[in-house]
Amino acid sequence: MDLFDAPRGLTVDLFAGGGGASSGLEWATGRSPDIAINHDTAAVSLHKANHPETQHYVSDVFTVDPTEATKGEPVALLWASPDCTHHSKARGAAPNRDKKRRALAWVVTRWAGQVQPSVIMLENVQEFADWGPLVGPVGDRQPCPRRKGRTFRQWVRSLEKLGYEVEWKLLNAAQHGAPTSRTRLFVVARRDGLPITWPTPTHGPGLKPFKTAAECIDWSEPMCSIFSTPAEAKTWGQQHDRNTPRRPLADKTMARIARGIRKFVVENPEPFIVGDQAPVFVPRYGEREGQK
């Protein structure tokens, strides 16, 4: 979908956070969102710094009245990135998944019903499409495997009943030029009669090479050694006027680092080497003090 095909009107960022999605909207449309909502004061402060011209609400998204917030102006685009942690598989079998947080996406249908945005976009983890009822005792609520996706389908139908055409798709950020391989679910709903189109991958086999995180890192920045003791990390923070890095790193983290060095440096025919732009910061080579 080409955002420039959308009619003129307000743009709204629910769950605005520090402003990452809002900056993306600004790059796509040429202007910052008109309205941004988040319950966290610190997040809104950061958002204000990035988007000072936006009208900000420090509030639970359900307590902001869409009609009052928009003051009768038409809404061209509503963006929503609800809390994903209580849907994500990264949470594993963690107890007590929060029913209220899993239900945050229902605020989208509230806005759709009251102010009829021409286009609605939602981004979340891919498990959002499995959104369904929770089962189990209080304190250990887990998604019901037999009713997987039931609530998501109800949510989609509610938008369709309000006159929206709804489509969803998994997109991998790396295939579109971002230096991360994360896959996210994107839902697009529109009621303006224009078609929903999806971006074509630009990076990958046969296309442009994937971008790497290394391209975004300033290797000349001083960094505390991963092998530092807590005392060494504290001294490093004081010397460089930085927060004290957490040391020692967890054993599993060190094991992942070791696997990465083996895969991308030691056993790689084209090893990844930073070069002389990075400062030397490794005082020893063992995983713990006393190892060499």
Description of each model-found segment:
Residues 18, 82-83:
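Active-site glycine-rich loops that stabilize anionic/oxyanionic intermediates
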Residues 7-10:
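Extreme N-terminal starter segment of soluble prokaryotic enzymes
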Residues 31-33, 55-58, 81, 165, ...:
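A generic, residue-level signal for flexible/boundary positions that often mark functional hotspots
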Residues 12-63:
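SAM cofactor-binding core of SAM-dependent methyltransferases
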Residues 12, 77-80:
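Active-site-proximal beta-strand elements of phosphoester/diester hydrolases
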Residues 66-77, 84-291:
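Class I S-adenosyl-L-methionine
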Residues 1-5:
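Conserved alpha-helix/loop element of class I SAM-dependent methyltransferases that forms part
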